[in-house]
Structures are given as C-alpha cells and as structure tokens.
Amino acid sequence: MSVSAAPAIPQYSVSDYMKFALAGAIGCGSTHSSMVPIDVVKTRIQLEPTVYNKGMVGSFKQIIAGEGAGALLTGFGPTLLGYSIQGAFKFGGYEVFKKFFIDNLGYDTASRYKNSVYMGSAAMAEFLADIALCPLEATRIRLVSQPQFANGLVGGFSRILKEEGIGSFYSGFTPILFKQIPYNIAKFLVFERASEFYYGFAGPKEKLSSTSTTLLNLLSGLTAGLAAAIVSQPADTLLSKVNKTKKAPGQSTVGLLAQLAKQLGFFGSFAGLPTRLVMVGTLTSLQFGIYGSLKSTLGCPPTIEIGGGGH
C-alpha cells in the first residue's frame, strides 16, 4: 500500500504508557515463569551437553529421576520478577520509542523507513530492559546450573553479592545484549510485518471480532518467536556459559566471551535449539496474545500503525 495522508497520531499520557508497561509485565512475567521447567532443561543441555544428551524428553526424565520434580522449578522467583520488569520496559519502552521516532521523523518518513523504526524502537527498549534484567538473570542461571548454590532468589542474590560483588551481576551484560537486542529486534520486526501479512488476508482489524484479533496476534507472535529464537540462539548458549564460568585473573569479559565461543564452535553454539524453538515460539505467541488482550481490558489507546511498504 502506498503512503497516503497521515492519520491522526494518538497522544499518549503517562497513564497510557503505564498501562502498556503493565500489560507487557504481565505478559512476559506469566509466560516466562510458566516455561521455567523447559528453560531448566534447556539450560542444563547447554551447560552440560555430555550429561544431558537424551533430548528434551529424556533430559526431563533424567532431572526428575536424579533430583526430583521440584528441580524443574529451580529459578522460578528470579524468572517471574526479572521478566516482569523486563516486559514492562520491553513493551512499554517499544511504544515510547516508536512514538518518539514517528513524532520526530514525521509520519510519511516513518512509513517509508518503518522497518528501521521498528528495529530502532525494539533495540532501545531492550537495552533499558536488560539493565534491569541482568542481575536477576545471572541469579537464575546460577541457581539452575548449581542447584545447591542457594535456596531461592534472595539466598542466591545475596550470596553472589557477598562473595563476588555487584559487578558479577553484570558479567553477563555484554552477552545479554548480544542475545536480547537481536532477539527483540527480530521479535518486534517480524511481529509487525507478520501482522500486516496475516491481516492482509483476514481483513481490517476494526472489522474483526476480538477472538479473531487474538488468534492473529498469537499466530504473528509464533512467527516472530521462531525467527527470534534462531537469531539469538548462539548468544543464549554463550550467556549460560558466561554466568557459570569465573573469569581468570585479569581477563576481560570480551576475552572470556572469545574463549568460550572458540570452545563451543559453530554447532556447539546451537546446542538446545529445538527445545528453545518450542519454548520461545510458544511464549512469544502467548506474550503478544496476552499483551493485545490486556491492552483492551486496561483501556489502552490503540497503538500506532505505520502504513506503506517500508525499508
């Protein structure tokens, strides 16, 4: 569709952005915490592929047999809290930055370069989200990889802080950025374009039922999740390794990353991909489904849709 007269751009209040953030927090927090058992298996496969080498189902059985079913909920606390905070920044921030770019570029220019608007908005929102997420993600990975390390979120967080200092929470910040920023760019870019594609067949959004809209959000989210999982898988594996490995004296984070990347190799960096495709595809689909439904429930104004083919 060619760019036509610019539609009226909604003006959001602080309250509106808070509603976007709340919807994102609930969507991300609930979905990530519900996937904790799968994430425990994925992380174990990444960290100890020679031990957990029987695939997803076999590794589930192996963990339950060796440690009990409760081991599959390891890291639930930091996952729920961390990803709720991240979701608030991720979705709320995306709306903030998309509005910022449209206001400053003008609607016509934003329409011509909408892929860049989507990508820039997603990247900036994710950077802020990762600052908040990093300490809790480091704690989660430590609890999953070392089940005897501490008893829950508070114990794990306190022990890391006491024994290794606050800087250790951000030892994985660089790989988190390498993982999450490409992931979030792919997630929102593919979701936006997939939505355009699917709505092109289904018809105008305003003429569809709420059930149809939710189903299209779920389908677009699934498409986005599969793409995002593949793009970010090598950095996800590297992140798991970084949070388990202590740096040698004088070794920089970049040096440790290079060392671990060399050890993993190309195929090793994709360890656990099938499991992660299931997990990320499912949770991304649910996130966008929940986010869309909650925006309606909370009385959020409509998000800005950018027309045109875009670059």
Curated annotation (Swiss-Prot):
It comes from the Eukaryota. Keywords: Acetylation, Membrane, Mitochondrion, Mitochondrion inner membrane, Phosphoprotein, Repeat, Transmembrane, Transmembrane helix, Transport. The modification N-acetylserine is found at S2. The keyword Transport applies. Residues 41-62, 137-165, 236-253 are mitochondrial matrix. One of its GO terms (cellular component) is mitochondrial intermembrane space. The chain crosses the membrane at residues 20-40, 63-83, 116-136, 166-186, 215-235, 254-274. The keyword Mitochondrion applies. It is a multi-pass membrane protein. It is found in: Mitochondrion inner membrane. Residues 1-19, 84-115, 187-214, 275-311 are mitochondrial intermembrane. InterPro entries: Mit_carrier, Mitochondrial_sb/sol_carrier, Mt_carrier_dom_sf, SLC25A3/Pic2/Mir1-like. One of its GO terms (biological process) is phosphate ion transmembrane transport. Belongs to the mitochondrial carrier (TC 2.A.29) family. Transport of phosphate groups from the cytosol to the mitochondrial matrix. This is Mitochondrial phosphate carrier protein. The lineage of its organism: Eukaryota, Fungi, Dikarya, Ascomycota, Saccharomycotina. The gene is MIR1.
